[in-house]
Amino acid sequence: MEALLASSTIVGLVLMTIPAAASSSERTTSAGSIANVPYSLILEDQFLATLHYLPVSFVPAVHRPAPTPTTTTTVPPTTTTSSSTTTTTTTPTTFSASTSTTLATSTTLKPAKIIRHDAKWPAALSRRNGRFVWRFADLPAAFRSQWHVGTANIIVVGALMRFQNVHNLPVTGNMDTTTWLTLLRAVLARQYSPTSYNFVYVQEALPEHLTLYQNGHPTFSSLVNTGIAVSPTEIGTHAVYLRYTSQTMSGTNPNGTHYSDPGIPWVSYFYGGDALHGFIRSSYGWPQSLGCVEMPFVDAQTLWPQTPLGTMVTVQ
């Protein structure tokens, strides 16, 4: 794997934070305090999807009221011996309950405990009945298979990293108190993601190449080189966690010799020492690197602005 070294222009850092206690200043409308909203994975999914940080949308269920029962009431006679009737209706008091949360692919989730809204927090922050559906039809199956409702999967981790980065929070991909309260405020303020949903798909089938998807549409492609057999690129879906405009890469070759390559441009790390970056080769499209995904300088420069922290990278 290609090592991380100090001679670099750093753009993003991954920092770990300890969740802090909620501040008494975290108050909102008279409907209640956002500090009272209990965290759950389902709510995290719902809010990140609502703000367009996920490749899925949350579609609230359409409320269909139950049929109104009809009763017949006999009106006492007044001046005659005959009786007349009139029809009246009564509407019983009911409470809606969630039954399940479903994916468009018919993957179902067992019902979670229902959080019934009360005055402790704004109604907009209560869990709602509904389902999650894919926003984009053309995303590869290898990527789509990573999404599961109500789990800390890599797609949710990447979305949370992206949210943290946009809101100038430490980018950990982990939920903490500060991130949760910031997410709740963003939902109330309808602060949607300011960028398109970007995804990088690296295919090792020859000739090796990558494709950039923006909001589900392929917008850019490049021939690339992935890792050789003794130092392969990590297969799977990962999140960009560290970026440099330029870096000196140094480490040890498989034969034990040392290497040091200064001025490696447009670097986006997505798994350990594996990164997307520019590198000069006589040809591209077949395994040549020590784990990174190499491409021509000009292509790396085009791709780099579209791979902010939290961007998903699938290697297949």
Language-model features: locations:
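Exported/periplasmic cell-wall-interacting domains
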Residues: V171, S193-T195, P232-I235, Y244, ...
